[in-house]
Each structure stands twice: as structure tokens, then as C-alpha cells.
Amino acid sequence: MAAMSLLRRVSVTAVAALSGRPLGTRLGFGGFLTRGFPKAAAPVRHSGDHGKRLFVIRPSRFYDRRFLKLLRFYIALTGIPVAIFITLVNVFIGQAELAEIPEGYVPEHWEYYKHPISRWIARNFYDSPEKIYERTMAVLQIEAEKAELRVKELEVRKLMHVRGDGPWYYYETIDKELIDHSPKATPDN
């Protein structure tokens, strides 16, 4: 181990002697036992910055930046045409004006909206108030019928308990003439 260390020092000294550069402090024997590697001839510069540059480990911002770039792209992709469309609708079509309703004419539910885009959305995507009312009334009727059936079932159960009846009232009693007693008469056959 000591021989390898000495061999390394000798080789460093030989290379330094051949290259003409001096080594650090010499401890004798022509520099064979030096304690350092060749020193730099010029002072060390750290790229003109305010000190030594460090490699700081921090989380990647790649996905954050990519998300924000794509978000801006898709907002521009959809927002600009939507803004142009709304501007054109407001300029060329405009809002509806209040007018007298002719006799015998029943307005549709979307005709009560002022803006044309609101009218289009109400006509194509929303149900009419009459349809919503009828649907709600149907649900209320079904729930009322269920409540009435629950009350009747509770009354039937009370009467069954009072009279000692059981669930057999669901089935008709079989006629006794249809029962075959022959297997019981001769069980060994």
C-alpha cells in the first residue's frame, strides 16, 4: 500500500519535472515526497459571478410550464373565436325588443329571453317550463300513490295481526279430491 502511494508520488513528480511546472512545497529528495498536486498558475475565476456557482437541486418545473403553455394555447384557441362570435352576434343581430303580442298567438318559452344566444340555448338545451311542471306533477302523483299503498299495506298488516291471519291468504286451497292417498295406503310397493 505504501509502495503504491510512493509510486504515485514519484510518477506525479516525474510528469511535473518533464512538463517544467513546479509542484507545491518540496520536502526533499527532489520533490519525490511532495504533499500535493500541481498548483494552478492563475487564480481561479468563477465565471465572473458573485462566487462559486452551485448546482442546486430543485423540483422540475417542466410539467408546470407545459401545463401553463397548453392552458394559454387552448384559451386562445377557444376564447378568441368565441369573443369574435359574440361580438358579431351583438353587432349584426342585437337584442330583442319588447313588442305587442298578437291575439291568439302563444309565445314559445325561449321567446321571453332578450339576447339571441340565450334564446338559442333555451330553445335547444333547456326544457320548457310546461314540460318541467308536468314532469314534477307526475313524480308527485307517483309518490302520492306510493304513500297511499303504504298506508293500505299497514292497515292490512294490522288487521292480519288482530284476526290471527297469516300470509296464506295469497294462495287458494287445493281441492281435497285432487289429493292422491294411494302411496300412503300401500307404502311397501
From Swiss-Prot:
GO terms for biological process: aerobic respiration; mitochondrial electron transport, NADH to ubiquinone; proton motive force-driven mitochondrial ATP synthesis. It is found in: Mitochondrion inner membrane. The chain crosses the membrane at residues 73-93. Its main location: mitochondrion. InterPro entries: NADH_UbQ_OxRdtase_B5_su. The keyword Hydrolase does not apply. Belongs to the complex I NDUFB5 subunit family. Accessory subunit of the mitochondrial membrane respiratory chain NADH dehydrogenase (Complex I), that is believed not to be involved in catalysis. Complex I functions in the transfer of electrons from NADH to the respiratory chain. The immediate electron acceptor for the enzyme is believed to be ubiquinone. Complex I is composed of 45 different subunits. It comes from Homo sapiens. This is NADH dehydrogenase [ubiquinone] 1 beta subcomplex subunit 5, mitochondrial. GO terms for cellular component: mitochondrial inner membrane; mitochondrion; nucleoplasm; respiratory chain complex I. It is a single-pass membrane protein. Keywords: Electron transport, Membrane, Mitochondrion, Mitochondrion inner membrane, Respiratory chain, Transit peptide, Transmembrane, Transmembrane helix, Transport. Residues 1-46 form a transit peptide. It comes from the Eukaryota.
